[in-house]
Amino acid sequence: TVNNHVGSYRREIMVPASWNGKEIIAHFGSVTSNMYLWVNGKYVGYSEDSKLEAEFNLTPYLKPGQKNLIAFQVFRWCDGTYLEDQDFFRYSGVGRDCYLYARNPKQQIADIRVTPDLDAQYQNGSLAVNLTMKGKGTVELELLDAQNKAVTTQSLNASGKVSTTIEVSSPHKWTAETPYLYTLRATLKEGGKTIEVIPVKVGFRKIELKNAQILVNGQPVLFKGADRHEMDPDGGYVVSRERMIQDIQIMKKFNLNAVRTCHYPDDNFWYDLCDKYGIYVVAEANIESHGMGYGEETLAKNPSYKKAHLERNQRNVQRGFNHPSIIFWSLGNEAGYGPNFEAAYDWIKNEDPSRAVQYEQAGKNGKTDIFCPMYYNYEDCAKYSEDNSMQKPLIQCEYAHAMGNSQGGFKEYWDLIRKYPKYQGGFIWDFVDQSVRWTGKNGKMIYAYGGDFNKFDASDNNFCDNGLISPDRVPNPHMYEVGYYYQDIWTTPGDLSKGEIKVYNENFFRDLSAYYLEWEMLKGGKVVRSGRVDDLKVAPQQTSTIRLDLGETCQCTEWLLNVSYKLKNREGLLPAGHTVAKDQLTLNPYKAPSMDLKNVETTNIETKAPVVQDSDANYLIVEGCGFRTEFNRENGYLIKYEVNGQDMIKEGEALTPNFWRAPTDNDFGAGLQKKYAAWKNPEMKLTSLNQRMENKQVIVEAVYDMPTVSAKLNLTYVINNKGAIKVTQKMTADKNAKVSPMFRFGMQMPMPRYFENIEYYGRGPVENYIDRKGNADLAIYRQTVDEQFYSYIRPQENGTKSDIRWWKMLNEAGNGIEVVASAPFSASALHYTIESLDDGARKDQRHSPEVEEADLTNLCLDKVQMGLGCVNSWGTIALPEYQIPYGDYEFTFILTPVKHSIEIE
């Protein structure tokens, strides 16, 4: 084989003399892609399957009390590689712990299996215990509760295969909500002497398939999941225990209750954590062969690979059998469908009837207990859910592709899941961006992806970066949206005039007594009242009405009610006070301000209209008390806006129409950088620039022809006596023209960089968009421009805030401008130009830290910006209601100079 590189590993070790006479086993947790093992120069054996442990009996080869040489070879590729075609970095080498252990060679519990179950009323429990013995002896079985107190004991005279059942009255049940674990302690004795002790964690739970649903302990739970590769930005396949605990903590923090081990068995410690902290697991076998095709050529139909398909699934089940967190076995991923998978399904269902078995390629009618498609769109999900002939639960094994700035439209998936009983959730692709830490061109740290290392290796560029969190485990902005729609407590209005709210407990197994409710009333974005409710006894799947002492409101402004639910005590990895759910209700709706710009009048002083200087050949100048504006006669744009000696527009720049954004990964996947290209720099032919005086205000109107998009555009500026400017951007489309939609309709104004401070009343604090804003509460926020930029691994549109009531750009002294509009609008302010974040017609090998900041603050004001979408990243765009089709649009906003303006501290 060409370029089949080899890694050779050698280590000299001292085996304790006390191990003499014992059976010594070598454990290799994960070696990619295979290994040949020698001990003291003698060949021991061979193993493949990169993601399952290999164990070898080294007893005949080792010399206890002496130095011993362990040596093994690892090949880059082997025949098993055809079944390991996963989409991720293809590393080689040792990825998990390697160690030796010693046991009694004649007497041991060779295998122990526990199968928990509940009775038909889900009340009492039973634990089937199956032992495989080497030799014989007495095995004492002791079931301990979480406080290490004995619940029940049994004693068996054991040899060969032995089975028993332990009955437990009303045990604590294991679920992701209530991950209660018992410990079964199996002690092997001979003549009163303890030979070995094996503890096994036990969770009492029952998995059933009934009425087109999967039930856990009789309840049709919702799977709020993500797919997780084992990847670390520094260790690659080597993921530390601390990193795994961190991942579990993040999952619990953002309300994830399920994980799919894509696309191979994980480190055993991961399943231990899922057992302990409560995560439902889809345990997947290490099979993916999409490179070989899905038709007749698939390896799923190749008899030569039948044994490999079967063994990989058998070993996956055998090593994970005792974990209560494993609810589903998955036969593999993207590997076609055929007899090889059918044989694996049959074997698992016979070996372990206590769990569900799934496989995406089996579709609706093949051998799978779950219909688990990938990237089903909303319509297909609804259609399947309404089809009564389909009697398998719908749980997408991959959905809501989280590539770059994404997860727009995530709400709509969960609207369907909460509507249809058969649709029980899914697993977001995927949990963590899989890039590696690297040094970029300018010496800054970047996260490298495919193509960064050379131009000849197979690569899918940044398609490894589809995570809810960054490689170093910082939540990406879209993770906050997921955390919101995955939450388990929901608040809706009751009779708000009486302070009544309705609280729905979406949990299936626990009431809300572990939480307290905090509420805040906001008047015009500011908190004016607050309170707390400690007694929340809302039963699972029930709604209760709670009355809050809200007091009086008025119709004068917008009133909002924030409600959040927090832990009373530490729970698992989450601290006391952690917010598990929240909602924001409207008490009195927002009313947009009048766009009737008036002069500022002072008592006993005559109002002086602005002065127009119309004689300059290059500029139309409008001046007034403490301000000066200049319009370029060549293009009609406002190029100077000076107030109290301070320029609001950076020299050389202008306030200009804006229809473009730096394409997101989803935009690129749909080819929008080309399909929408007419809007990137549309030709703007100035046909007239006029000014007139009305009511002691100057009105400047610039009229444009936009031939490349078959439209007309009017920019109208009304300037009052203090330099406030009402801007109206009005576009009229040609109804007969066929022109693409646009990314946004608005304007951009590059300002001097020292406008570093932002205050706004809108959604925040993280970026949010028209189709991704459920998590972002309305409030008054004070932030810096530096804080607006989110360093997605590949540069793209970011930093936008939506539903803005007012927005201020301020310098350190609190001086600047305030923006209000005729309706809530979107805005962003970055130290980057749109052009600098835009790859152009095709993706380049670019990284956000390598993009140079501009010496300006680029303010974008939008009537609307297109949504982000999340169905996939290779063609499907945002829902129609979140698109901006070609048509007539009008956007009116007012720029008002402000001094010493600080709303909040």
PLM region spans:
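Glycine/proline-rich low-complexity spacer/linker segments in large multi-domain proteins
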Residues: 44-45, 64-102, 176-185, 562-590, ...
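Intrinsically disordered, low-complexity Pro/Gly/Ser/Thr-rich segments with frequent PxxP/GP/PP motifs
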Residues: 155-170, 525-556
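Extended carbohydrate-recognition surfaces in non-catalytic/accessory domains of CAZymes
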Residues: 1-27, 78, 82-86, 91-94, ...
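Extended substrate-binding grooves/exosites of carbohydrate-active enzymes
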Residues: 79-82, 87, 103, 193-502, ...
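A short beta-turn/strand-edge loop motif at beta-sheet boundaries
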Residues: 133-138, 508-515, 737-741
